[in-house]
A protein has these predicted regions:
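N-terminal redox-cofactor-binding region of secreted/periplasmic oxidoreductases
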Residues: 2-600
């Protein structure tokens, strides 16, 4: 019955999303030429392409994936997800499938804005001011957040938030529909009991506190960059889009000018290799992993590594170095089944989807409790008094974020394969979760380290452009990241002991994990071991083609000409928040750089 309910829900979703393609498709021919070629139709690539095309330029946007399918969670691990495997380091992700951390990344129009959890957080002004890069201070970048922001419910924010927002931008943003899940308010009340202030706007004067965040949602539907930029009638009239077209390298002339790209197009008849040319510039927006791979395949990267693969070196640059990512330990809190959102009603998802189709409302227009989040500085938490304190400016700089999800009572029963595909967890962990979920709903509250110290690398596994690169995220290699997670788990232990949580028998699930000490004998040892087993990526990797080392201040690749990078790989450090906002701002920013150069 559980599997039947799941299949019916997916059938309803499939019927809705098998509608006519609303995005134009360009049929490519070998040798086609455009003014600008942009590789990757994701968070940054779609805005950049749309802005340049609307300015009157001949723009080709190529995307390795295809059209946009349905619901966010079902897409993780699907064909619309690159689902990059990684090289294990034996100290993280030990209870993931094959002990490999998996990096999800959208492989479709809109990229990761099509499969993420839709949270709109810009980060902290210090994230940009501390870079020390000319033209990339907070005051330089915030106009680009405002340019695309079209906040539809400004009246729900305090008047102090008005200067921080725009209501007329191209990306319509708003609050999620109330899910009906009582934990939505209970999480907030529990954190308030620990003196976390309620913050009505994490993009306003302060990030600190617990909040219901603004999301990339409009009229009950996801607002990806594909929907916000590419689906506009004025954009469709002027922008060329090539789907299912994977870039395999940049073409250079003898003077190191980027003059085009090599691609592989995919269709029912098989793969076809083409060469496409740009009169003016090539812009790589393939994401932190994809952009690094394309650069190295094209001879831009660490010389020793490229020489080892017999790739001619065009520019010896630290491509693929300094990778950082938001990482967390997955923490599960079983709660009394009477507090479950649907209390075992297996067919409620089908009814919810029907209600959504009719009215764009109801629980299916919500993202459950995912829009409830908290940011704080763990060094400003008094563990003896069990309260967050606010006694210095440093307390305004968060180092941790709590994110939430909810597994309803019996929701994952009989769905082992589906859960493993979407989560990447080992079957042993999934089966333990199923046992807990048989009798209780499960609140998932996980602490994200916002500025991790651990650094990883990306290298080519081979010179074959259709093979995944060798990704070594190296999570938890710096012990300071583990210590921050241990602090956050102690705060979670305090949280489940608040009256709001105790009323529903909430407790942190202590999973059986091989090699971990018994909790009753060694609490800290158990949680340290747990962290290394239950490591999970937020899919926010940055830094593989960073500003100041690989790129100049206008996102131009050093050592070559007519080639730029516009995606999260450009950021030397992670923003303190979800990264989609920064990616879109970078796309807007590179369009300005290019238009300014074209005008001069």
């Amino acid at each position: 019955m559980i599997l039947l309910a799941w299949l019916l829900t997916m059938l309803v979703v499939f019927i809705y999303y098998c509608k006519d393609d609303i995005y134009n498709t360009t049929l490519l021919q070998d040798g086609d030429t455009s003014d600008y070629i942009i590789v990757g139709a994701g968070g940054a690539g779609a805005p950049a392409a749309a802005r340049l095309a609307l300015a009157g330029h001949d723009v080709l946007l190529v995307e390795a994936g295809g059209d946009i399918p349905g619901m966010a969670v079902t897409l993780l691990g699907s064909d619309m997800d690159w689902a990059y495997p990684t090289i294990l380091n034996n100290i993280s992700c030990r209870s993931s499938l094959d002990q490999q951390c998996r990096l999800s990344c959208g492989k479709c129009l809109g990229g990761s804005t099509t499969i993420n959890y839709m949270m709109y957080t810009r980060g902290n002004p210090r994230d940009y001011d501390d870079l020390g890069i000319k033209g990339w201070s907070w005051n330089d970048i915030v106009p680009y957040f405002l340019r695309y922001e079209g906040l539809e419910e400004l009246h729900r924010l305090p008047t102090t938030s008005i200067p921080h927002h725009n209501t007329a931008g191209i990306m319509k943003l708003g609050f999620f529909t109330e899910s009906g899940n009582p934990w939505h308010s209970s999480i907030i009340q529990g954190l308030k009991a620990l003196n976390f202030p309620f913050n009505s706007d994490m993009n306003g004067d302060s990030q600190i506190g617990v909040s219901q965040v603004i999301g990339y949602v409009h009229e009950g539907e996801r607002m990806s960059t594909a929907r916000g930029y590419l689906a506009r009638d004025d954009v469709k009239r002027v922008l060329k889009i090539a789907k299912d077209t994977q870039c395999t390298g940049v073409i250079f002339d003898d003077n190191n000018n980027a003059i085009g790209i090599k691609v592989v197009t995919k269709n029912r008849k098989g793969n076809k290799t083409l060469r496409l040319y740009a009169r003016k510039e090539v812009i790589l927006s393939a994401g932190t992993i994809g952009t690094a791979q394309i650069l190295m395949l094209s001879g831009v990267g660490p010389a020793a590594h490229l020489n080892s693969l017999d790739i001619p070196v065009r520019a010896d640059l630290p491509v693929g170095e300094n990778i950082s990512d938001h990482v967390l330990p997955l923490m599960y809190i079983p709660v009394h089944p009477g507090f479950a959102a649907r209390s075992g009603d297996l067919f409620k998802p089908v009814r919810d989807m029907v209600e959504w189709f009719i009215s764009r409302g109801g629980p299916a227009a919500s993202n459950g409790v995912t829009d409830v989040t908290a940011m704080f500085n763990s060094h400003c938490y008094d563990f003896d008094k069990r309260k967050l304190i606010h006694n210095s400016l440093d307390c305004e700089l968060p180092n941790l974020q709590l994110i939430n999800a909810f597994i309803e009572h019996r929701q994952i029963q009989g769905l082992e394969v589906q859960v493993q595909k979407s989560s990447g967890l080992s079957m042993d962990i999934i089966q333990q979760l199923q046992v807990a979920n048989q009798h209780q709903a499960i609140l998932v509250t996980s602490p994200v380290v916002l500025r991790p110290y651990s650094r990883g690398t990306i290298r080519l596994a081979s010179a074959d452009p259709l093979k995944h690169p060798a990704i070594f995220p190296n999570y938890l290699s710096d012990e300071r990241d583990v210590q921050e997670m241990l602090c956050s788990i102690k705060i979670l232990e305090h949280l489940v002991e608040t009256p709001e949580y105790k009323a529903y028998n909430a407790s942190i699930l202590r999973l059986r994990l091989p090699g971990c000490p018994d909790f009753s004998c060694d609490r800290e040892g158990y949680w340290t071991c747990y962290i290394r087993h239950m490591t999970y990526s937020s899919f926010h990797a940055v830094g593989s083609a960073r500003l100041g080392a690989v790129l100049d201040e206008q996102l131009r690749v050093r050592g070559v000409a007519r080639l730029r990078v516009a995606d999260l790989s450009a950021l030397p450090e992670l923003p303190r928040g979800n990264t989609a906002a920064a990616a879109i701002a970078i796309g807007e920013r590179v369009a300005d750089f290019i238009l300014q150069d074209a005008a001069s």
